[in-house]
Amino acid sequence: MIYDFEGHTPKIDPGSWVASNAVIIGKVELKKNSNIWFNTTLRGDLEPIIIGENSNVQDGSVIHTDPGLSLIHISEPTRPY
């Protein structure tokens, strides 16, 4: 489910994937090729949350911000060579 909150609509890149029962609220941005898995909640009701390119948030995760603490930014994972 995707929810607007106080005039803020989540920004979801068309190349990202969101599980059918994930919840995304407010000031959340999903970059290209990001994945949000089952039973996950991203609550951007207070401050922004950015999930970077090629990143994923695994099953059952809850990410929420506190007032006045800028943002949460999950960036591309390190890849082994």
Q: What is each model feature region?
A:
Residues 26, 44, 59, 65-67:
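Residues on the solvent-exposed faces and adjacent turns
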Residues 72-81:
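Single conserved hydrophobic/aromatic residue that forms the stacking wall/gate
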Residues 1-33, 41, 45:
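Extended, small-residue-rich solenoid/repeat segments and analogous flexible loops
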Residues 11-13, 18, 30-31, 36, ...:
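All-beta strand scaffolds that present successive hydrophobic residues in beta-strands
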Residues 9, 48, 70-71:
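Short, structured helix-loop boundary elements
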Residues 1, 68-69:
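Acidic/polar low-complexity surface segments
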